[in-house]
Regions:
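Mixed-charge, Lys/Arg-rich low-complexity intrinsically disordered regions
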Residues: 1-14
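Compositionally biased alpha-helical segments
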Residues: 52-53
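A short, compositionally biased
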Residues: 4-5, 24-26
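A short macromolecule-binding patch
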Residues: 28-48
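Short beta-strand-centered aromatic/proline hotspots
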Residues: 16-23
Length: 53
């Protein structure tokens, strides 16, 4: 399992690159660069990889 923290840069299979804005238990709030939208995703199920912290 990967650990995530606010400020981490991630890449999502569908939404592309984004930045973690908040971690709440198993949920990650990620603001995606391409759309400018923030999405709430489950960290153990979302197709994301950490690029940098």
């Amino acid at each position: 399992k990967m650990a995530f923290a606010a400020g981490d840069t991630v890449d999502h299979k569908t939404f592309g690159r984004g930045r973690v804005t908040k971690v709440d238990g198993d949920s990650l709030y990620i603001k995606f660069a391409r759309t400018g939208q923030t999405k709430k995703l489950l960290k153990d199920y979302a197709p994301i990889v950490k690029i940098s912290s």
